[in-house]
Amino acid sequence: PQIETLKPGVKMTLLAEHPALVTPTGIDLDDKGRIWLAACHTHFRPEGYEGPQHDEILVFDADGKNRRVFYNKTDATMHVEVGPDGWIYLAERDRVLRVKDSDGDGTGDTEENLATLDTVADYPHNGLSGMAWDPNGGLVFSLGENFGKDWTLTGTDGAKVSGRGEGGVFRCTADGKGLRRIARGFWNPFGLLVRADGE
């Protein structure tokens, strides 16, 4: 289909498409222009699905070429965000984690949980989802309405936030400390953005 841009001078170029990627649920760019993408193979996986058992965190060069799998050990992966010091941040339904390639082979081999969600709800896309960085280097992420079930979110330092039936936006440090809720009253807030002024 023909795509029309709304702003003069903006150009859109197709860089990658199916079958190189499947069900993209998050995308980010790093300082080298590489494209990081969460390809979700586990969201309502159909019977007889022949794709990978888990979701894939894919990396493409800036031109959309040289597809490689960085990580493939998460399920219901709803977002990917490039972070500081080589960490790649992921939002799964029940946790926010970060993954790093510590030996330089291009594959994530070190994983750390930053925030874990304790709840009986398991619907794949109304748990943890969107992520962004605030101007002070804090990680901002969101939680959906969680099917109206009780939940408790816990950071790496033991800080806890609990609730029921409403989505929200949370902030913690890049290593999962100081967890706190900064907004509430959302359905499933996937596309988080933080302006330069922190709003």
PLM features: residue spans?
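Beta-propeller domains with acidic blade repeats across secreted/periplasmic ectodomains
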Residues: 1-199
